[in-house]
Amino acid sequence: KKIILSLSIILLTFISNAQQTATLLYHWQDSTLVASTAHNNTYNECWGLEINSYEIAVIGSTAGTHFFDITDPFNSTEVAFVAGAYTGTGVIHRDYHDFEGYLYVVCDEGNTSTLQIIDITNLPDSVSTVYDSNALLTRSHNIYIDTTSAKMYSCGTNGTMQVYSLESPQNPILIYSYNTGVHDAYIINNIAYLNCGGNGLIIEDFTMVDTIGDQPTQLASFTSYPDAGYNHSGWLNENKTIYAMLDENHGYDVKLLDVSDLTNISVLSIFNSGVDPQSMAHNGIIKGDLLFISYYHDGLRVFDISDPLNPIQTWEYDTYPSNNYAGYKGAWGVYPNLPSGNIIVSDMQTGLY
């Protein structure tokens, strides 16, 4: 079956607490790219950039990494593409994070995959690959860069989480291997909120980890909570008091945690999209008082969490209209941090919105 892919940008204008459907601004299709054998997904993660006063959307596919100038959403255009070291129907995951004018790219499939570092400072005119090697890592599920400490955390690398110094952004240096399995992470000022699958949420302080042999300090372990499943991902609010935690299981709720005291973490509320008993959240990002979630089959879901005891769903956009809730389909990633307020959402089967 031919897969029709789309790239679109959604503009959200927040004017009330009533749930509203977001407005679609731009749509791009490419029917030439193949889908994965595993999940029939051609796209995976999305990311956003502001470079030289231009807004750029980054999209991962089975072919590689696509860059779009979306400064004027109605006239958006693809401006660059970097092929993956591993491509084709075996690709499911790619992941991205940027630091100091470079985009860091990983893939979780293929024995020929690499860490790619792409110079993005000349966008929207061009990009250039400055590093493409498996000397440090071959496969990685997720990466997160703590820009405050110039460290990159690579999750799911050889069964560990590896920590790299980015003091020289083009030449990462491995400084630590964390031997507990970590699926995803959020890190700021060396404090790492680690989503460890069946081992729940672990919080570690990596302040003293600068060379091989140094050890982090564990600050908390949170494993017993309502709807505890596969602890998949999470995001911290700006005040470092509220943490949104997502377990990747059909029918499991999103949790808001009080993390103001790491010796006494508590669940403030649990909630869901309200669409289907088998709905499943994937990734979330907190911006201000809003929690943006790529909610798999239910598309984009936005919650007002100004009262963390009573989150209110305010916006939605269904990127995957099918009512089949089996497997992994629909919205994969979300990026709400562009200066314009435009929101990027990637859908595994229908492209990027």
Where are these regions (language model features)?
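Bacterial Sec-dependent N-terminal signal peptides
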Residues: K1-T21
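Feature marking well-ordered beta-strand scaffolds used for ligand recognition
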Residues: A18-Y353
